[in-house]
C-alpha cells in the first residue's frame, strides 16, 4: 500500500518571472499527482502539497534544481493529497499577505533585516539564560493560538496577517521593544516577514525559530515550551506532537477542553470556525458561534426538529 505525505516549504529569493515559475510548478505537480496550495511572488515561493511519498521525493528533487530553491528546506507531515480539494498555484504580490510588499526586501540569502534564526535547542537555551525576560510573540492568527501556543506567549489580536502592521504600530507592545522577543508561527515563513517588520519599527532584539513550531515540536514533543495542538490549514485542522499533549482550547458553550474547530451551522452568512466539544456540536441548539442571530437560527432548527447535517 502506498504511503502518502504532506510537504511544507518556502524560500525567500528574488524571482524575476513569477509567472514562469507558476507554470513550471503547476506542470510539475500535475505530473506527480500532487495537490495543495502554492503561492509565488517576486519575493519567492510558499507551498504545501501532498501525495504519494515517492512523488513527494521527486518533487523535492526537481524543485531544488531551480537555482533559487537549491537550499530550500522541506518539512514532512502526516497526510496526503486527499487532505486538499485540488491543486492551486497562484502568483501574488506577497507569498504571505502582510500588506507590505514594497517594505519586504529579499536577496539570494533570504529576507534582508529579519530576526536572528534560532534552532529549537537554542530557543530553550535562550530561555534558560534569560528567564522571564524572554517574550514569545505569536505570529499567527489569534484563532490558531486558541488550541496551542508557547508558554505565556503574547498573542496579538489579529484575524489575518494583514492586521499585524496596525497591531504592532498601535503601541500595545512598545514595552517589548527592549526585550528579547521570540516570534513563532507554524513553519517559520510568517516570522521571516513579521520579525523584519518589528525590527523596522524599533524592536531591538528579535528572534525567529528555524522551521517554526513544526520543527520545535518534532524535536521536543510535549516536553518543551510548546503547549497544546498545532492548527493546520488542511482537512486535519490540527496536529499534535505525541499522544501526551495537553488540550488548552475550550468549548465556547460548556468550557470542556477541546482542540476541535467546527463551523457555525448558519451557512448563509456565518460559517465561522469556533471551538466546540463533540457533545455541543452534536446538539443542533448549540451548534453555533454564539452570535445572537446564529443562536436564534439554531434554536429554530431545534424547535422544528431539523438537523442541517442530516437533511443537507
Swiss-Prot record:
UniProt cross-references to Pfam families, sorted A to Z: Rhodanese (PF00581), Rhodanese_C (PF12368), UPF0176_N (PF17773)
Residue positions of the active site: 185
InterPro entries hit by this protein: Rhodanese-like_dom (IPR001763), Rhodanese-like_dom_sf (IPR036873), Rhodanese_C (IPR022111), TrhO (IPR020936), TRHO_N (IPR040503)
Sorted UniProt keywords: Oxidoreductase, tRNA processing
Coiled-coil residue spans: none
Cited PROSITE patterns: RHODANESE_3
SUPFAM superfamilies the UniProt entry points to: Rhodanese/Cell cycle control phosphatase (SSF52821)
Enzyme class: oxidoreductase
GO biological process: tRNA modification
E.C. numbers: 1.14.-.-
Domain Rhodanese: 130-225
Annotated catalysed reactions: uridine(34) in tRNA + AH2 + O2 = 5-hydroxyuridine(34) in tRNA + A + H2O
GO molecular function: oxidoreductase activity, acting on paired donors, with incorporation or reduction of molecular oxygen
Similarity-based family: Belongs to the TrhO family.
Role summary: Catalyzes oxygen-dependent 5-hydroxyuridine (ho5U) modification at position 34 in tRNAs.
Protein name: tRNA uridine(34) hydroxylase
UniProt gene name: trhO
Amino acid at each position: 500500500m502506498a504511503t502518502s505525505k504532506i510537504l511544507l516549504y518556502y524560500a525567500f529569493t528574488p524571482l524575476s518571472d513569477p509567472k514562469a515559475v507558476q507554470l513550471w510548478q503547476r506542470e510539475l505537480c500535475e505530473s506527480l499527482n500532487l495537490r495543495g496550495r502554492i503561492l509565488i511572488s517576486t519575493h519567492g515561493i510558499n507551498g504545501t502539497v501532498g501525495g504519494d511519498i515517492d512523488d513527494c521525493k521527486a518533487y523535492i528533487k526537481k524543485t531544488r534544481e531551480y537555482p533559487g530553491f537549491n537550499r530550500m528546506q522541506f518539512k514532512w507531515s502526516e497526510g496526503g493529497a486527499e487532505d486538499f480539494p485540488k491543486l492551486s498555484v497562484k502568483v501574488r504580490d506577497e507569498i504571505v499577505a502582510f500588506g507590505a510588499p514594497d517594505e519586504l526586501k529579499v536577496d539570494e540569502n533570504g529576507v534582508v533585516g529579519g530576526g536572528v534564526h534560532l534552532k529549537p535547542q537554542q530557543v530553550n537555551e535562550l530561555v534558560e539564560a534569560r528567564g522571564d525576560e524572554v517574550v514569545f510573540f505569536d505570529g499567527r492568527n489569534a484563532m490558531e493560538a486558541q488550541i496551542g501556543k508557547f508558554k505565556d506567549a503574547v498573542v496579538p489580536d489579529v484575524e489575518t496577517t494583514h492586521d499585524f502592521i496596525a497591531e504592532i504600530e498601535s503601541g500595545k507592545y512598545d514595552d517589548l521593544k527592549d526585550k528579547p522577543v521570540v516570534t513563532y508561527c507554524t513553519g517559520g515563513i510568517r516570522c521571516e516577514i513579521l520579525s523584519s517588520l518589528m525590527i523596522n519599527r524599533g524592536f531591538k532584539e528579535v528572534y525567529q525559530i528555524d522551521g517554526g513550531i513544526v520543527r520545535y515540536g518534532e524535536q521536543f514533543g510535549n516536553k518543551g515550551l510548546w503547549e497544546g495542538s498545532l492548527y493546520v490549514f488542511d482537512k486535519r485542522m490540527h496536529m499534535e506532537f505525541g499522544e501526551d499533549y495537553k488540550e488548552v482550547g475550550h468549548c465556547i458553550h460548556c468550557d470542556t477542553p477541546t482542540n476541535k474547530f467546527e463551523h457555525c451551522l448558519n451557512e448563509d452568512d456565518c460559517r465561522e470556525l469556533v471551538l466546540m466539544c463533540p457533545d455541543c456540536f452534536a446538539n443542533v441548539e448549540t451548534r453555533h458561534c454564539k452570535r445572537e442571530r446564529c443562536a436564534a437560527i439554531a434554536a429554530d432548527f431545534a424547535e422544528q426538529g431539523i438537523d442541517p447535517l442530516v437533511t443537507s
